Amino acid sequence: MPSRRNVLKQLAAIGALAGLGNLPGKAFAADGANPEESALASANTPFHMPEESTFQTRVWVAFAASAAIWGRDYKEVQATIGRLVQAMVPYTQVNVLCREAEQARARQLCGEQNTRFIVAELDDIWLRDTGGVFVQNGEGELGLVDFNFNGWGDKQEHEQDAGVAELVSKQADARYLQSKLTGEGGGIEVDGNGTAILTESCWLNSNRNPGMSKAQLEAELKANLGLRKIIWLPGIKGKDITDAHVDFYARFVRPGVVVVNLDNDPESHDYEVTRQHMAILKQATDADGNKLELHVLPPPLDGRDNRFSRSRDFAAGYINYLPINGAVIAPEFGDKAADSYCHELLARLYPGRDIVQINIDPVAAGGGGIHCITLHQPA
């Protein structure tokens, strides 16, 4: 599988964008902040991150592709986001963040059925990473953890995107909770019952959490997300802008059941990495001591040949799908056998849900997928 988003590393700062104006500063970053709001480091925090396929209130996307980042492809990327929104709205409400100057185009491409458009200042489309992580507590209160997005270790301009999580929390009427850690939502996979799968290459990285030990990082993540156990995969540093987010390697379907990416292209750097991950997951147990049931979902080997798929960053991974109410939204890459297997496997793993596959080649050329550009809000 080609690497992800290398092409974005060299981007210069983007000019000011039309929108809401400057977002307020981080609410609880300073020492001595309100302990009720910022004490995410406490092991007794009532908040936990639900498993993704549980019932959702809505899905968020960022209609933010620009020529500054995407060059000549930005209109195709915008159209792909519109196609994704239209695939989701029969099943769930979609909130679309967009720049003020692009509202008309966003409405044209996304449609206005079951959608809400929110003006925001944005750098890029990767809302899974910029929008924070929704959590809940035992009283049904919704929270949102801000993991202090820093452009995947200052690899990309992120002045506007650094404020998106706080914006989302306000728009969702969720309690804003700021972590001590720096990371991204695409780097977190949970079963909703206390177990998470993470990659060391992403979280134990000096470009995000310098000087922090594994034990310190685990303690903070467990407090932030209500975890009892973390299964660590090695990942791989420096091959893509994210340093190997877990949402391209392993996904929980429900507690005890995991979909695993196994790259069968011997020329891919992920060929060995995914086999290391498989070996670890075969031996792993969840927070309750149960072995994991693993299902392999390999990338396509014979997909469409176009200018997008020829990008060295083309992310041809089915595993980056999104479960929503009544459906699973997944990519198709023009490899008939692989596309069909993806559909068949997801139909077995998510019974009773429609499996909707769409062409995401323009987004995949930027190194991401459907999961990367969406943010689900639990009910």
What is each PLM-predicted segment?
Residues G32-A379:
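The feature marks the mature, well-folded catalytic cores of soluble enzymes
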Residues N6-F28:
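N-terminal export signals
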Residues M1-S3:
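Secretory targeting signals
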